[in-house]
């Protein structure tokens, strides 16, 4: 060939995703892509790299996540992701879109340009997610369509409003058609959908889903022709339930995602690299696990020339020392080694928090001691709906205790009111916790067993412009301000993680026997499109009946 390329990598065992094997071979890289895979006497290189016998796999891909759940700005999350061998992510900026509309989307695109991590955005399909909560913005099809002109946009994010699709809502169908007309596709959100209901999604071209919580559900989606993103996040951990149905003949339909994962957990156990390690530990061959985490995800997200280490593919790769319990040794994106990252977070003007609450708003009169109660399910964003006997005072008002706490969601954009309910599972002995992260409209959400700490939490969240807070019975607080739309911090990830740990440590002191992330769990208690009983700023919502219900049983 007689050609000189930029970089020659040799002495490596390199994954072949097409033949599902590691091969002792070489890579010749030029202009950000792999020019040739194999040994050559004709090629020369300006730079040579001895991989010292280590393994090389394609850069890992997170097929679906929400950056905001990490509490980090995109450029800060990128630093963590790259450390764990993740070179591409497909992110749904639904959260900031719900708070700040198109200005939030522009901000996320701008931030994505400050990092070598490939950040592909899927435009939020449902802002607001439903008509059962008030959001800070409304994103119709005509507002989203111009964004397809940005190279960072890869399609339409998880379509979660099943009734809108089933009933032929014109705006929802236009959003899906616009994505397809731009050469992209639409992701699905099939939580709790039956096999017949999946056909409604397939009829409009929705071809992925990340909401499978069992092997049975995963196989139903594959039978329907959908690609399955196996989720292992902070709250929702579905991988162990799904891995047993992953086979050689269907593995091409599976890839990995984290969906919602805290910065603490990414630092502690990893991102998609954790999914891979878990898969290998459960008997999935390493070649298959790494292929699922790279090439399969790229195919599912309709991205070409990504996810494989061969001629013509983007040179995104990870060097690892072993397969079973691998650690990322070195990372490359587009032919460049990722070394020290020093980007600064872009500033963002956030909307004010306009909710108004008083002690009187926390009174919850009941007709009897029987009430509908939200029951937390650890490691899941779903809840159970039960009718329980609870305590009341002499005036008939609910009295919180160690088993049953109050939970309130206050509309934060225009002070349109609040919903008040009862929740079981936080095991709080005192105080309150609160946040302006409350999927999907991100109103203010507070849970507690003492009214005064709940009001202190409200007041501090309003003053800081959004964030996370814990208040003990004496009024002492632990706080994490979230300067970017009340969702993300503009601080370095190390500082954010330290404050997250402080909050979790403080919660351990006011609760008993909790082994899940209380703040991330709290954030999903306001999500009405996920079963079974949730609460929004408009009241208590029964997913099974798909309507609001009275708290009195």
Curated annotation (Swiss-Prot):
Pfam families: Adenine_deam_C, Amidohydro_1. It catalyses: adenine + H2O + H(+) = hypoxanthine + NH4(+). One of its GO terms (biological process) is adenine catabolic process. Its cofactor is Mn(2+). GO terms for molecular function: adenine deaminase activity. Its EC number is 3.5.4.2. Transmembrane segments: none annotated. InterPro entries: Adenine_deam (IPR006679), Adenine_deam_C (IPR026912), Amidohydro-rel (IPR006680), Metal-dep_hydrolase_composite (IPR011059), Metal_Hydrolase (IPR032466). The keyword Hydrolase applies. Keywords: Hydrolase, Manganese. Belongs to the metallo-dependent hydrolases superfamily. Adenine deaminase family. This is Adenine deaminase 1. It comes from Oenococcus oeni (strain ATCC BAA-331 / PSU-1). The lineage of its organism: Bacteria, Bacillati, Bacillota, Bacilli, Lactobacillales.
């Amino acid at each position: 060939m007689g050609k000189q390329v930029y970089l020659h990598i040799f002495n490596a065992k390199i994954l072949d995703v097409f033949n599902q094997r590691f091969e002792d071979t070489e890579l010749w890289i030029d202009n950000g892509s792999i020019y040739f895979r194999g040994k050559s006497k004709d090629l020369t290189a300006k730079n040579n790299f001895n991989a010292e016998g280590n393994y090389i796999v394609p850069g890992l891909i997170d097929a679906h996540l929400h950056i905001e759940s990490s509490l980090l700005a995109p450029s800060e999350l990128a630093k963590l992701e790259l450390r764990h061998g993740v070179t591409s992510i497909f992110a749904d900026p639904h959260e900031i879109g719900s708070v700040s509309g198109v200005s939030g989307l522009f901000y996320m695109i701008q931030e994505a340009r400050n990092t070598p991590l490939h950040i592909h955005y899927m435009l939020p399909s449902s802002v607001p997610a439903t008509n059962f909560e008030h959001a800070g913005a409304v994103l119709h099809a005509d507002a989203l369509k111009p964004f397809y002109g940005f190279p960072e946009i890869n399609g339409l994010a998880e379509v979660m409003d099943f009734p809108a699709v089933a009933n032929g809502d014109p705006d929802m169908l236009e959003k899906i058609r616009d994505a397809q007309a731009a050469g992209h596709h639409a992701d699905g959100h099939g939580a709790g959908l039956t096999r017949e209901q999946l056909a409604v999604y397939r009829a409009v071209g929705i071809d992925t889903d990340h909401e499978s919580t069992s092997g049975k559900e995963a196989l139903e989606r594959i039978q329907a022709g959908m690609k399955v993103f196996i989720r292992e996040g902070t709250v929702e951990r579905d991988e162990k339930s799904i891995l047993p149905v992953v086979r050689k003949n269907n593995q091409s339909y599976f890839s990995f995602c984290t969906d919602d994962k805290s910065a603490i957990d990414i630092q502690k156990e990893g991102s998609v690299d954790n999914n891979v390690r878990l898969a290998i530990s459960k008997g999935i061959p390493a070649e298959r696990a790494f292929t699922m985490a790279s090439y399969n995800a790229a195919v599912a997200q309709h991205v070409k020339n990504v996810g494989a280490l061969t001629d013509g593919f983007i040179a995104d790769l990870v060097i690892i020392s072993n397969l079973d319990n691998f650690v990322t040794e070195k990372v490359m994106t587009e032919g460049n080694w990722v070394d020290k990252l020093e980007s600064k977070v872009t500033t963002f003007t956030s909307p004010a928090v306009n909710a108004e609450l008083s002690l009187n708003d926390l009174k919850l009169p009941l007709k009897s001691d029987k009430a509908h109660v939200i029951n937390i399910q650890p490691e899941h964003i779903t809840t159970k709906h039960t009718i329980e006997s609870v305590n009341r005072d002499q005036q008939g008002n609910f009295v919180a205790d160690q088993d049953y706490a109050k939970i309130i969601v206050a509309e934060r954009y225009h002070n349109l009111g609040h919903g008040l309910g009862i929740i079981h599972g936080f095991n709080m002995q005192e105080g309150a916790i609160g946040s302006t992260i409350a999927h999907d409209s991100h109103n203010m959400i507070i849970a507690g067993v003492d009214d005064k700490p709940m009001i202190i939490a409200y007041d501090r969240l309003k003053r800081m412009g959004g964030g996370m807070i814990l208040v003990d019975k004496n009024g002492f607080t632990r706080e994490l301000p979230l300067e970017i739309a009340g969702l993300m911090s503009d601080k370095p990830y190390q500082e954010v993680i330290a404050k997250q740990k402080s909050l979790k440590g403080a919660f351990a002191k006011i609760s008993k026997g909790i082994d899940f992330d209380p703040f991330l769990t709290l954030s999903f208690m306001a999500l009405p499109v996920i079963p079974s009983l949730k609460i929004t700023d408009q009241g208590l919502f029964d997913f099974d009946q798909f309507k609001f219900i009275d708290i009195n049983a």
